[in-house]
Amino acid sequence: MTNMPIIQTILASLAFAFSNWKKLIEVSVFPLLMALPLVTILPEMMGVLQAQLFGVGQVQAYPKFYQLYLLMFDYGYIAILINIYRLVVSGGASVARLGVVLPSIRLGRFFVLFLLLSIATQLPLFFISPLLIPLVYFLLIPFALNLVSIANDIPYKKIKLPARVQLSVFLIKLGVPSFLVALVILIGAQFVFWVAMIIIIYWMSISFALCYRVIVANNSAQNL
């Protein structure tokens, strides 16, 4: 594969979202329930963090069970990724009702790779420069594509991509979110911020899974 059609993939991602919106809502029920406890205490946690880091307001203790709520939120986030990756690649029949994701080998493998990728992308923030985060993210795209493989019970394998294709995947997945973030900064409304965050989560998941489908389909055709 030598080229990834950016415009066509963006349009395909939008078409998928609009044509499968009911299923997307259904597979989000369980992840949303897992994330809800943290969402309810988020304003209180933000107040504590602002007091500790920036000296804004009075320093208070963290809410009760916040660590448990953080774990539940992470579980919910991973669950929505797995559900969307399966929905895009394998179809609606491959996703459990209401998007329930139970502990399994698949979930464990997904979590381990997800954790390693998350740590790798955040390393520049602590040791070098935050400006290098996009570069690290770009370099890790072939490994990140295996998250889609694992979600669909496909064995892990090294995915080799030409630099041009890798750049296209990077732009497709992060181009729209970057535009939305810039728009939110200009508007500055809190409600718009949360709507944009939800859109970004779904966009990145759907577009990335579609990129995976295109790459796998082209590689299979070339091997015939």
What are these regions (language model features)?
Residues 1-4, 34, 45-46, 72, ...:
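Detector for methionine-enriched segments
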Residues 1, 55-59, 198:
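Charge-dense, low-complexity intrinsically disordered segments
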Residues 95, 219-224:
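Short, Lys/Arg-enriched, Gly/Pro-containing loop segments at transmembrane-helix junctions
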Residues 43-53, 122-129, 183-191:
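Juxtamembrane "helix-exit" motif on the non-cytosolic side of transmembrane helices
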Residues 23-91, 178:
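Short, small/hydrophobic-residue-rich motifs at membrane-helix boundaries and re-entrant hairpins
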Residues 2-34, 98-123, 138-185, 224:
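Interfacial aromatic "cap" segments that immediately flank transmembrane helices
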Residues 5, 60, 94-96:
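A diffuse structural propensity rather than consistent per-protein peaks
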Residues 60-92, 122-154, 189-219:
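Selective recognition of hydrophobic, aromatic-rich stretches within alpha-helical transmembrane segments
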